[in-house]
Swiss-Prot record:
Gene name linked to the record: palH
Organism expressing this protein natively: Erwinia rhapontici (Pectobacterium rhapontici)
Family to which the UniProt record says this protein belongs: Belongs to the glycosyl hydrolase 4 family.
Binding site for Mn(2+): C171, H201
Domain of life: Bacteria
Pathway linked to the protein: Glycan degradation; palatinose degradation
UniProt xrefs under InterPro entries: GH4_Enzyme_sf (IPR053715), Glyco_hydro_4 (IPR001088), Glyco_hydro_4_C (IPR022616), Lactate_DH/Glyco_Ohase_4_C (IPR015955), NAD(P)-bd_dom_sf (IPR036291)
Gene Ontology BP annotations: carbohydrate metabolic process
Pfam families according to UniProt: Glyco_hydro_4, Glyco_hydro_4C
Name of the protein this chain belongs to: Alpha-glucosidase
Cofactor note: Binds 1 divalent metal ion per subunit. Mn(2+) is the most efficient metal, but to a lesser extent, can also use Co(2+), Ca(2+), Fe(2+), Mg(2+), Sr(2+), and Ni(2+). Cannot use Zn(2+), Cu(2+) or Cr(2+). Binds 1 NAD(+) per subunit.
């Protein structure tokens, strides 16, 4: 029988087209049945037509259909891929940033950590739990892959509510290592053995070795990273180029320097001034930039590249939304590799998945979802234990109670636990104003937060 794959949120052209292209190029998934699902029938119909036209043009034997009925879509599913957002993403994100700011709370980014990350979680996790409830009822053995953020809070809450489900979080930040390290170390990516780990958007490179010699490569990373990243262009440079030339910069599969014709950044350590502090003081290289890593650290506001973060937000909101995605027969995300690994019992090592901590990071409890490498075979996704240095472990440990209280607040629908989740978060520097802040957020985001009592 053909493998059945369900895409939840397929009305999003960026998610739908990109994932379809990944699937269509796969030999192991050749001839699969793909069910597109979205609550927006107009957007869903566009994705369906585009997919069918592409299959006809390329003469590929995949079966594609679409439905707005989720339970119908899930019947017989072996794999379910989720990428959803609720409401007007940017309007709600602005509230997540601006309202806490009115109460004296400064945030680096406000999407996945801090107060913004909490309210984002409170909105998006309930509908994901609804999806998971249907999976548990209709296709409980299916593997579920999630691309939605805030990743670690979503995965933690889902596994608390549905511990029996095969739910895996996927993020592409790990791909930064493939973009930068070969150029930095003057070797091919295939010659590097790498391990990274932590929490989603809060992970660091832990080990690096040259395969041909077996020698430690991390010493070279620490020695060469300062000069390399100090001159690497960032989003301020990309935004300026886009405004000047009226076209987007394509950094997929290459560095920003190559995309901008070999130019250096207009200022040092673009997007990475917090990154620089972590590298210098903790001797570990983050696998992401300040906008993500800084969301979880109370002192990040002092040292983050705010110019780069604001320019990234502007670029993301004003330019990326206008890009017309297309279906291409090339692998862009790693979820297809995992599905292939399960179907073929390959036993390959996947660089990063978000799964419950089953002793993979000793400084963290079992309930929290961690980002670690994993072995993929016919039995599924098996995390690999990693050694986290004490200092990084301390930063990660600050998230334990936040994730615990976020999950409990959502499952119980508890306003009091939301207040507590804010009060244990070191990004928050307020106390008496927090109950009022929570009430204002519930009022302003009533369609999504009215379950909190």
């Amino acid at each position: 029988m053909a493998t059945k794959i369900v895409l939840v949120g397929a009305g999003s052209a960026q998610f739908g087209y990109g994932t379809l292209g990944d699937i269509f190029q796969s030999r192991a998934l050749y001839g699969s049945e793909i069910i597109l699902h979205d609550i927006n029938p107009v957007a869903l119909a566009v994705t369906e037509k585009t997919a069918k036209d592409f299959l006809a043009k390329e003469d590929l034997p995949f079966i594609v259909s679409a439905t707005t009925d989720r339970r119908t879509a899930l019947r017989g599913a072996e794999f379910v891929i989720i990428s959803i957002e609720v409401g007007d993403r940017f309007a709600l994100w602005d509230l997540d940033w601006q309202i806490p700011q009115q109460y004296g709370i400064q945030q680096v980014y406000g999407e996945n950590g801090g107060p913004g990350g909490l309210f984002h979680s409170l909105r998006i996790i309930p509908p994901i739990l609804d999806i998971c409830a249907d999976v548990a009822d209709i296709c409980p053995d299916a593997w579920i892959f999630n691309y939605s953020n805030p990743m670690s809070r979503i995965c933690t809450t889902v596994h608390r509510r549905f511990p029996e489900l095969n739910f895996v979080g996927m993020c592409h930040e790990i791909a930064s290592l493939e973009r930068y390290l070969p150029e930095m170390l003057n070797t091919s990516f295939d010659n590097l053995s790498l391990r990274a780990g932590g929490l989603n958007h809060f992970s660091v490179l832990l080990d690096a070795r040259y395969k041909d010699s077996g020698k430690d490569a991390y010493a070279d990373v620490r020695a060469k990273a300062p000069d390399y990243f100090a001159s690497l262009p960032g989003y301020s440079d990309i935004l300026a180029y886009t405004r000047q030339h009226g076209k987007l910069v394509d950094t997929e599969g290459s560095t920003e320097r190559h995309a901008l014709g070999g130019k250096d950044s207009s200022y040092p350590w673009a997007d990475r001034t917090l990154f620089k502090e972590i590298l210098e003081k903790f001797h570990c290289m983050p696998i992401t930039v300040d906008s993500h890593f800084g969301e979880y650290i109370s002192w990040a506001g002092e040292v983050s590249d705010h110019r780069g973060i604001l320019d990234f937000y502007t670029f993301y909101r004003n330019y990326l939304g206008g890009v017309q995605p297309k279906i291409e027969l090339k692998l862009k995300e790693r979820v297809v590799s995992i599905m292939e690994g399960i179907l073929t019992d390959s036993g390959y090592e996947e660089a990063a998945v978000n799964i419950p901590n089953r002793g993979f990071i000793k400084q963290l409890p079992e309930f929290i979802a961690v980002e670690v490498p994993a072995i993929i075979d016919r039995k599924g996704v098996h995390g690999i234990q990693v050694d986290i240095p004490p200092g990084i472990g301390g930063l990660l440990s600050n998230q334990i109670a936040i994730h615990d209280l976020t999950a409990e607040a959502i499952i119980a629908g508890s306003r009091d636990l939301v207040i507590q989740a804010l009060l244990v978060d070191s990004v928050n520097n307020q106390c008496r104003a927090i109950p009022e802040l929570v009430d204002v957020m519930i009022s302003r985001q009533q369609p999504w937060l009215n379950y909190l009592k």
